[in-house]
Amino acid sequence: MVRLTVMVLGLIAAVSGLVTTADAETPVEWFTLGARVHGGFGAFIPVGIRIGLDALQRLNARPREVTVVYYDSDKAPCACIADGVAIATVASPGQRTLQIAAETAPAGAMAVVIIRKKQSGEAVKYTVADSWLPKLAEWNRTLDTRGRYDAAMKAEGLFDMAQMK
């Protein structure tokens, strides 16, 4: 009986872990959330979602377990990427877990995002080159919402990522 109870508890724990990690938003849920938070779902929002999801995976973190510092540039239309990162990581200015830096992104970058795991201090840095601006603008002009999402999620070389201490 004890052995059966231990096996059942182990199975429940394993399934719970699968459910938690598989509990992701669908593309339609991302569109709806992005539009609600940002006021629309242009091509920059899924760039931020992709960065945020990638960081959570690399840092082995769950939403709300990270802090975000976003460096914007004067070349980007607005800090749209930051809103995508925010909805993917559940970081927010109100929780003091998302900051838009006073300093700008370095030359050649339209955005730099540093995402740090609160518990360990481990961090990853993402740089989106300003050479992506024409392609993102084209996606906004020529693709529907789903097309923008898919293009951003599949684009090779969309950002550079570096581990930080």
Per-segment meaning from a language model:
Residues 23-41, 46-165:
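Non-transmembrane, aqueous-exposed alpha-helical and coiled segments at domain scale
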Residues 7-17:
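Bacterial N-terminal signal peptides
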Residues 6, 21-22:
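N-terminal compositionally biased, intrinsically disordered segments and leader/signal-like regions
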Residues 1-4:
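Positively charged n-region of N-terminal signal peptides that target proteins for export
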